[in-house]
């Protein structure tokens, strides 16, 4: 019996460790001047003190969120202003929140679960803590490719993982694909954050899905050989390293560029002004896209209010407010995008089921360790 218990514990640890490492690594390179940060709150999700007591007759919706972007709170505030429904936020890592939802079961006060990465959203679904979102409005707002096949989670915003480059040292016509960064011509010029970062794990997971494990490994190995330095810091730090001439190109998420360009820190603005953004693989598989998303908690006690909040977040007004602050791409095509995103124009994206990012996460982590991507 003890052997079975230990085996189960080991399997559980192996399944959850990649996600925990990835999300925890997102804490690197944060900056208080930004409008949004990619990492989850480090506060314990088990602290009941984080949940305001409900007053008699008060309309509420309880949101368990692994995002702690300032713009999200503004979004919730606007929803409350328009509907009178108070939004209570409980923050933690995605893994903490999912485990809490499982542990509390029917007694859980959670109505919504919000996090980043399609693989993590599918992880929540696989753990049985979500239920289908039934709303014609949401179906109209969010295209099918940005929704779970059973509608247990939907995208609320997207972000592209692109190549950024030094405008004074690299011409955009020198760039083409992610695969090309493994070419010898980029020897000692590529900057990237750690393999423990979920964004990089999901990028590699997408290559495994689209190109096969063998090609994904060959690419990662070639990229490691071209590193300008040992991976360190967050996405902003890669841009700053380009400015410091530590390397010429880097892989980072688009929304960081928007945040840096609109930062209160003059140095961040200067760094962002001197890097170019390139959307790779336009003639092949497309640029890697990932999502921030929402799931409806299985035992939501304020289901109607939760659906109303999802409809607001994915509606034109909510999408405009969200993306103007986070510089993510809206999922609702009717939303007014920030001028910067409009300037970047339309681009081809990878066509894959976001659930595959989670399914291939373990292989991606093993592959990254194998090729020496620290």
Q: Regions from the language model: what does each represent?
A:
Residues 215-218, 327-374:
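An extracytoplasmic/periplasmic, membrane-proximal ligand-sensing/linker region
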Residues 118-129, 146-176, 201-205, 289-295:
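Periplasmic solute-binding protein
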Residues 108-113, 131-163, 179, 189-192:
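A structural signal for short loop-to-beta-strand junctions that line the ligand-binding cleft
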Residues 64-67, 149, 165-167, 187-211, ...:
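Short beta-strand->loop
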Residues 46-123, 374:
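Early extracytoplasmic/lumenal segment of secretory-pathway proteins
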Residues 206, 212-278:
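Ligand-binding pocket segment of bilobal, Venus flytrap-like solute-binding proteins
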Residues 292-351:
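Mature extracytoplasmic/periplasmic domains
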Residues 1-60:
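Short, low-complexity disordered leader/linker segments with a strong preference
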């Amino acid at each position: 019996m003890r052997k079975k218990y230990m085996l189960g514990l080991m399997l559980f640890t192996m399944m959850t460790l990649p996600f925990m490492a990835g999300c925890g690594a997102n804490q690197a390179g944060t900056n208080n001047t930004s409008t949004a940060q990619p990492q989850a709150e480090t506060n314990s999700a088990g602290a009941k003190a984080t949940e305001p007591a409900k007053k008699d007759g008060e309309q509420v919706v309880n949101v368990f969120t692994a995002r702690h972007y300032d713009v999200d709170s503004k979004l919730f505030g606007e929803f409350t202003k328009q509907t009178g429904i108070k939004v209570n936020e409980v923050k933690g890592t995605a893994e903490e929140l999912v485990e809490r939802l499982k542990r509390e079961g029917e007694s859980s006060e959670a109505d919504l679960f919000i996090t980043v990465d399609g693989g993590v959203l599918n992880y929540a679904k696989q753990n049985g803590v979500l239920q289908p979102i039934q709303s014609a409005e949401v179906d109209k707002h969010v295209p099918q490719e940005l929704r779970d096949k059973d509608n247990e989670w939907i995208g609320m915003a997207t972000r592209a993982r692109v190549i950024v480059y030094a405008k004074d040292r690299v011409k955009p016509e020198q760039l083409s694909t992610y695969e090309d960064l493994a070419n010898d011509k980029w020897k000692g010029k590529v900057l990237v954050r750690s393999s423990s970062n979920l964004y990089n794990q999901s990028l590699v997971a997408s290559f495994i899905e689209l190109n096969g494990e063998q090609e994904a490994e060959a690419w990662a190995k070639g990229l490691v050989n071209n590193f300008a330095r040992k991976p360190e810091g967050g996405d902003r730090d890669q841009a700053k390293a380009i400015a410091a001439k530590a390397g010429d190109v880097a892989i980072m998420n688009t929304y960081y560029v928007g945040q840096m360009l609109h930062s209160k820190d003059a140095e961040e603005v200067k760094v962002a002004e001197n890097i170019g953004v390139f959307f790779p693989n336009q003639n092949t598989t497309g640029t890697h896209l990932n999502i921030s998303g929402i799931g409806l908690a299985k035992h939501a006690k304020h289901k109607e209010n939760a659906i109303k909040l999802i409809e607001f977040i994915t509606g034109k007004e909510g999408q405009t407010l969200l993306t103007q602050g986070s510089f993510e791409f809206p999922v609702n095509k009717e939303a007014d995008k920030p001028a910067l995103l409009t300037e970047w124009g339309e681009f081809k994206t990878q066509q894959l089921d976001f659930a595959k990012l989670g399914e291939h996460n373990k292989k991606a982590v093993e592959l990254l360790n194998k090729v020496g991507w620290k």
